[in-house]
A protein has these predicted regions:
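Generic alpha-helical secondary structure signal
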Residues: 103, 110, 186, 201, ...
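C-terminal structured domains
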Residues: 236-325
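A contiguous, surface-oriented mixed alpha/beta subdomain in the mid-to-C-terminal portion of proteins
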Residues: 176-259, 265-268
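Acidic, low-complexity proline/glycine-rich segments
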Residues: 148-194
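Leu/Val/Ala/Ile-rich N-terminal alpha-helices, chiefly Sec-type signal peptides and the beginnings
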Residues: 1-156
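Charged, low-complexity surface segments at secondary-structure and domain boundaries
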Residues: 90-112, 191-201, 208-212, 232-233, ...
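Short amphipathic alpha-helical coiled-coil/interface segments
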Residues: 105, 109-112, 116-119, 123, ...
Length: 325
C-alpha cells in the first residue's frame, strides 16, 4: 500500500501564508478556599466583604483583577486581528500582519510584566493594608498569604507562534514492535499507513473548512459595517466622520487578513477606499452621499453572495499547490 503524499499538501501549504499564534497567561488568583467552620460560622450580615462564594479575596478587586483585565485585552486584541483556527486557543495570522500583531501583543505583555513587578514590590504593603482593613477578621486572613517568592513564578504572559506540518515520510516500524504485537510486518505497515492516510485527510478537511470559515467571517464583518452606513443613508441620517472612519478601518482589516485572495470583494473594497477619504464631508453633499450609497450597495451585494465561497477557497488551494512547500 502506497501513501499518497499529496494528502498533506493542503494543510502544510496553508502555513506558507501565515502562522498560528497563541497567548498563554498565568497568574496568581489571590484567593483562598473558605474554611467552612472557621470562616462561615457567622450570621449572613456578619460575613465580611472579602469572602465570596467558596473563596476569600486576599486583596481588593482593583489589585486582584488587574491581571485578568490585561489578559482579556491581549486575548481580545489577538481575536480582533486574526482568524480563529479550529484548535483550542489558536489564531491564524497571515504573514503580512504577523509583525504588527506580535508587536501589539508585546506591548500588552510589557504592561502585564510591569504590573507584576509593581505588585510583587508592593506585596507586603498591600497585605498589611488588607489586614488593617479587616482587623476584626485578621486571624482568618493572615495565614492565607504565601511568601512572595512562592508566587512570583505563577505570573507569565507568553506569546507563541508555530506552524503545523506532518512528516512527508512514514516512520519505520521496528521489528521489535512487530514481534511484541505478534503481527506480520506487512499487516502492521498497512495498518499504520491507513491510519496516516485517514489522519492526513482529516487535517486537509480541517484546512479547507478553516479557509472557508475565514472567508465567510471576513465577509460578514464587511456586511455588518457597510450595512450600518446603508441604513443611515436610507433613514436620511448624517454620515459622520466616525462612520467614514469605520469604513476605512474595515477595508484595511479585510485587506490585512485576506490571505486566500477574495478578489471580487477586494476589488469592490478598493473602489470604496478610493471614495471614503479623510477630506470627504457628507453632511450637506447630496451628490457625495449618492455616490457613497452606490458603492456601499455594490460592496454589500458582493459580500453577501456566498455562492462563490467554494470557488474562492478552491482557487486558493489550487494556487498554493503550484508552489512546493
Amino acid at each position: 500500500m502506497k501513501t499518497d503524499t499529496t494528502l498533506t499538501e493542503k494543510f502544510n501549504k496553508l502555513f506558507q501564508d501565515g502562522m498560528l499564534v497563541f497567548v498563554h497567561v498565568g497568574k496568581w488568583e489571590m484567593t483562598q478556599a473558605v474554611d467552612q467552620e472557621k470562616d462561615l460560622g457567622l450570621k449572613a450580615e456578619d460575613v465580611p466583604d472579602f469572602i465570596m462564594p467558596g473563596k476569600k479575596k486576599l486583596f481588593p478587586d482593583e489589585i486582584r483583577l488587574q491581571f485578568s483585565r490585561i489578559e482579556q485585552r491581549g486575548r481580545t486584541y489577538l481575536r480582533d486581528n486574526s482568524l480563529k483556527f479550529p484548535i483550542v486557543d489558536a489564531h491564524f495570522v497571515p504573514h503580512r500582519k504577523l509583525v504588527e500583531v506580535y508587536d501589539g501583543l508585546t506591548k500588552i505583555k510589557e504592561e502585564y510584566d510591569k504590573a507584576v513587578v509593581a505588585f510583587l514590590a508592593n506585596y507586603e504593603k498591600y497585605k498589611a493594608e488588607m489586614l488593617a482593613a479587616h482587623h476584626d477578621n485578621r486571624a482568618s486572613l493572615e495565614d492565607c498569604y504565601p511568601p512572595v517568592d512562592l508566587i512570583k513564578d505563577r505570573f507569565r504572559f507568553e506569546i507563541n507562534m508555530c506552524e503545523i506540518a506532518f512528516p512527508r515520510k512514514l516512520k519505520a516500524v521496528s521489528i521489535v514492535q512487530v514481534r511484541a504485537q505478534n503481527l506480520a510486518v506487512e499487516k502492521m505497515q498497512a495498518k499504520f499507513e491507513a491510519a496516516q492516510e485517514a489522519h492526513h485527510r482529516e487535517m486537509n478537511e480541517t484546512a479547507e473548512k478553516f479557509v472557508k470559515a475565514a472567508c465567510m467571517d471576513l465577509r460578514s464583518q464587511v456586511v455588518a459595517t457597510f450595512q450600518t452606513i446603508a441604513d443611515k443613508i436610507a433613514n436620511k441620517e448624517v454620515v459622520t466622520k466616525t462612520n467614514v472612519k469605520s469604513l476605512r478601518e474595515i477595508i484595511e482589516q479585510f485587506s490585512s487578513l485576506d490571505f486566500y485572495g477574495d478578489a471580487e470583494v477586494q476589488a469592490k473594497l478598493l473602489e470604496a477606499k478610493a471614495l471614503v477619504k479623510n477630506d470627504v464631508v457628507y453632511k450637506d453633499d447630496a451628490a457625495a452621499v449618492a455616490k457613497l450609497n452606490e458603492i456601499v450597495g455594490s460592496v454589500l451585494t458582493v459580500a453577501r453572495n456566498v455562492s462563490d465561497v467554494d470557488a474562492v477557497t478552491g482557487e486558493y488551494f489550487r494556487r498554493i499547490n503550484l508552489n512546493p512547500v
